[in-house]
């Protein structure tokens, strides 16, 4: 892809540990060496964001079959609006990860160094009270 947009979506049904601004900053720090990355935020449907920004393809990582069931439904809805979805299999070493697991480990000083970039690790430890 010539340009990759990493969009932080505001989900009112989830309680995020970090603000949208904090999440955007962590993504920018993590991807600073990749010149074709654009970081943005959006409140609404992903497909509407794509249409408004002339994006034809959404890429999604899949950890397990349970991810695929949900994501396939979303992909079919998005395809009706003219936006395709490309699925990428997660590295098996990371297929068990979830944000709740990483937050729990950080809270109790578990080693998350192989699970998140260093800047995210620092932010998580600070936010959760870990050391």
Model regions and ranges:
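Nucleotidyltransferase catalytic core that binds NTPs
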Residues: 1-131
